[in-house]
UniProtKB/Swiss-Prot annotation:
Pathway: Steroid biosynthesis; sterol biosynthesis. Its main location: endoplasmic reticulum. It comes from Oryza sativa subsp. japonica (Rice). It catalyses: lathosterol = 5alpha-cholest-8-en-3beta-ol. This is Probable 3-beta-hydroxysteroid-Delta(8),Delta(7)-isomerase. The lineage of its organism: Eukaryota, Viridiplantae, Streptophyta, Embryophyta, Tracheophyta. GO terms for biological process: sterol biosynthetic process.
């Protein structure tokens, strides 16, 4: 027996009882997200320039990134984790629509794949707040700043590895077309591979330099 509203996801036999079709277009979903993200980055950049301590441009950009990634983890990913019936809501929220759209690139989200929910849950509950703490640590010049950044980056990279490896092991058949594979599955996640890698390397060097400095002092 078919669904009242056939879903657009792959594989076609995916069972989604009560599925409610998307009510917003791709543009209506992406434009507000991108506009809000740009506004956030601009706001953090401007605020970071007024900190009581002088910050380098690198630190200000890092504050922008950690604010963006922290709020993304908490708000966007958090709504996925704690709204298991987002695909069947008769009056869907904007975030329900976000995840129904993204699921065209990875149907494990709309299918509530246990591994995916687990990774996103850890990300939303632990890495989200830790990312916002990194904003404060950088602004305040806290001694734990680089250790915190390095740790969160490792968590993000581990999450990405699990995300991609489980997709491969499960058959790589979760997207509706090559466009959604490259735009959503690869493109939307690439920032959380490239940027955390760069930050982790930088923080590792800073931590090593600090330990080396302590060794010189104790000689």
């Amino acid at each position: 027996m078919g669904h009242p509203h056939p879903h657009p996801y792959a594989p076609a036999e995916l069972h989604l009882p009560g599925f409610v079709p998307l009510q917003l277009s791709q543009a209506q979903i992406l434009v507000p997200y991108l506009a809000t993200s740009l506004f956030l980055l601009l706001a953090v950049w401007l605020i970071s320039g007024r900190c009581s301590r002088r910050l380098s441009d690198t630190d200000r950009w890092l504050m922008c990134w950690w604010a963006f990634t922290g709020l993304t983890h908490i708000i966007i990913e958090g709504t996925f984790v704690f709204a298991p019936n987002f695909f069947s809501n008769q009056n869907p929220s904007y975030f329900d629509e976000v995840w129904k759209e993204y699921s065209k690139g990875d149907s494990r989200y709309v299918a509530r794949d246990p591994a995916t929910v687990t990774v996103e849950g850890i990300t939303a509950v632990l890495e989200g707040p830790a990312s916002l703490l990194a904003v404060y640590a950088i602004a305040s010049g806290k001694s734990y700043s680089h250790i915190l950044q390095f740790t969160v980056c490792l968590g993000q990279l581990y999450g990405c590895l699990v995300y991609f490896i489980t997709a491969y092991l499960d058959g790589f058949n979760f997207w509706t077309s090559p466009f959604y594979f490259w735009a959503y599955f690869i493109g939307a996640n690439s920032s959380w591979v490239v940027i955390p890698t760069m930050i982790a390397i930088r923080s590792w060097k800073k931590i090593c330099a600090a330990f080396q400095g302590e060794k010189v002092k104790t000689k």
